[in-house]
């Protein structure tokens, strides 16, 4: 799906950056600072990751001037590392949206109890294990893996490189592996960050109807064993949902948030990005969560229904109490 590698000098030229180091190094992946290793390139655009920069094992890093003294590996100096990272993802994504594959391999899967419904499209290099059933109108992209005895309802879309474990159930019209909300600001417009990661559903996961699970920008969005989603749940890029957690309808979880094991999250909740919710937490419906929850318990945040004038008075009193 993606070109395998580039020379560091090629990357520097593509970005219009200033290379410090060995331009002949081969770069095959983009990774976060802590995950990066030999053959990968990373980036830093926020000072809170300065310690990660100092500890990185990346072959090279995209940096701005303020981080030069903290970088112990080869680097490419650029004006805006976040924008340059976005452009680099576009380079690595290659021909992702430049052509459409019309070759359907659905007829290749007719043994081991596998059943493929009418008008199902299956891309190349797909692995479908025994006993799996895929209903009419579903789309299975290139390089997808589907574990044994999984049941896929009609009109499900699995984007390229998604991995589905054993005995999963995916209900109608759900989309797994779409891009997350990722853009870098370049002053007068937004530069798209191509999402080079994937989605991994472990074993015994159930996804309700019309859910969306976005692929990771790098790495994987993960739903661990036994996770259950109600209808119309949104899981953003790079989230990690702990095993046996249940999430009610129309809840939306923003990017890179980690939900612990055995949590119960009611319907209609909103959970912001980059927070962590501890194991065993219960969240009542319509709660808006803006910070990490560090101890188990039952949490609520919805407001009671009042006439609007009374609601305004109620909120004003509450605000004064918190201000005091």
Q: What does each of the following model-derived ranges do?
A:
Residues 1-107, 162, 167, 173-174, ...:
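Terminal amphipathic alpha-helical/low-complexity segments used for targeting or macromolecular assembly
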Residues 43, 104-307:
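Structural signal for interior beta-strand "rungs" in well-ordered beta-sheet cores
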């Amino acid at each position: 799906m993606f070109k395998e590698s580039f020379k560091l000098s090629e990357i520097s030229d593509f970005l219009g950056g200033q290379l410090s180091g060995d331009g002949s190094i081969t770069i095959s992946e983009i990774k976060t600072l802590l995950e990066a290793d030999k053959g990968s390139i990373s980036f830093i655009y926020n000072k809170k990751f300065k310690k990660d920069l100092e500890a990185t094992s990346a072959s090279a890093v995209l940096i701005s001037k303020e981080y030069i003294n903290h970088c112990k590996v080869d680097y490419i100096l650029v004006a805006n590392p976040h924008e340059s990272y976005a452009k680099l993802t576009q380079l690595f994504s290659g021909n992702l949206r430049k052509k459409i594959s019309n070759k359907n391999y659905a007829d290749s899967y007719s043994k081991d109890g596998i059943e493929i419904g009418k008008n199902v499209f299956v891309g190349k290099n797909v692995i479908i294990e025994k006993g799996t059933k895929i209903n009419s109108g579903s789309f299975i992209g290139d390089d997808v893996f589907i574990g044994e005895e999984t049941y896929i309802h009609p009109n499900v879309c699995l984007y390229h490189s998604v991995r589905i474990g054993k005995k999963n159930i995916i209900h109608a019209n759900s989309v797994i592996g779409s891009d997350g909300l990722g853009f870098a600001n370049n002053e007068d417009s937004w530069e798209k960050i191509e999402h080079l990661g994937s989605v991994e559903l472990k074993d015994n996961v159930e996804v309700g109807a019309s859910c969306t699970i976005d692929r990771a920008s790098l790495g994987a969005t993960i739903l661990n064993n036994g996770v259950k989603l109600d209808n119309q749940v949104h899981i953003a890029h790079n989230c990690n949902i702990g095993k046996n957690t249940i999430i009610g309808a129309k809840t939306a979880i923003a990017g890179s948030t980690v939900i612990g094991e055995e949590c119960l999250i009611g319907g209609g909740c909103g959970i912001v990005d980059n927070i962590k919710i501890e194991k065993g937490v219960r969240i009542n419906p319509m709660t808006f969560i803006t910070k990490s929850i560090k101890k188990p318990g039952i949490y609520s945040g919805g407001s009671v229904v009042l006439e609007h004038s009374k609601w305004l008075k109620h909120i004003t009193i509450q605000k004064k109490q918190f201000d005091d």
